[in-house]
């Protein structure tokens, strides 16, 4: 019996370790809340900041950027037809419709592309990093997100900003190119 126990334990370990590997597949979710580190490279300058991403599947995506001390300074709200960029520090915003993106950015983003970017498949306990590059006129823009924490189906109704408190401006005033 003393000889048989190590053999049975070894066989048990071998069978337990021979399970099929599961690929990182997107989870079926209605809402997604995650924390991330966003790195933005604009031409030769690079910026890195904390971010919070909230996704209501096929409805709304809210990206909140907190460059320092966890204070939200910039927010982007993407819906199926447009993206609203909000500069909270200067109380101003701009609305960009996806058909206007084709004139500004190559490749032109869509709601589906943004949703896939921020809800990339994730393996448990492993940081997920997604990257995307764009060209905006003569400028090259690269965005990388390292997602560190995810919670599925925990969000209630979206908390959108009341834009009455903000002044609508052109994109060039928010992003001087």
What do the PLM-derived regions correspond to, one by one?
Residues 20-82:
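Start-of-domain marker
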Residues 30, 96-97, 106-116, 167-172:
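General structural signal for secondary-structure boundaries
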Residues 14-17:
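C-terminal motif of bacterial Sec signal peptides marking the signal peptidase cleavage site
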Residues 108-133:
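Charged, gly/pro-rich active-site loop segments
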Residues 2-9:
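Sec-dependent signal peptide recognition
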Residues 89, 125-177:
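Non-transmembrane domains of secretory- and envelope-associated proteins
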Residues 51-59, 81-84, 104-105, 113-114, ...:
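Short, low-complexity, polar/charged sequence segments that are solvent-exposed and flexible
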Residues 61-111:
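An acidic-aromatic
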């Amino acid at each position: 019996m003393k000889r048989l126990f190590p053999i049975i334990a070894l066989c048990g370990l071998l069978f337990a370790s021979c399970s099929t590997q599961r690929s990182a597949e997107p989870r079926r979710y209605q809402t997604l809340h995650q924390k991330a580190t966003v790195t933005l490279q604009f031409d030769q300058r690079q910026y890195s900041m904390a971010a919070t991403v909230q996704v209501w599947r096929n409805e709304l995506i809210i990206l909140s950027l907190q460059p320092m001390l966890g204070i939200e300074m910039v927010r982007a709200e993407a819906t199926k037809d447009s993206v609203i960029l909000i500069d909270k520090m200067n109380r101003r915003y701009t609305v960009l419709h996806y058909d206007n993106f084709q004139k500004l950015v190559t490749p032109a983003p869509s709601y589906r592309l943004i949703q896939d970017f921020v809800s990339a498949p994730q393996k448990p306990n492993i940081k997920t990093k997604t990257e995307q590059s764009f060209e905006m006129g003569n400028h090259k823009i690269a965005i990388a997100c390292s997602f560190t924490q995810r919670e599925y189906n925990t969000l209630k109704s979206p908390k959108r900003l009341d834009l009455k408190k903000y002044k609508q401006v052109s994109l060039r005033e928010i992003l001087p190119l």
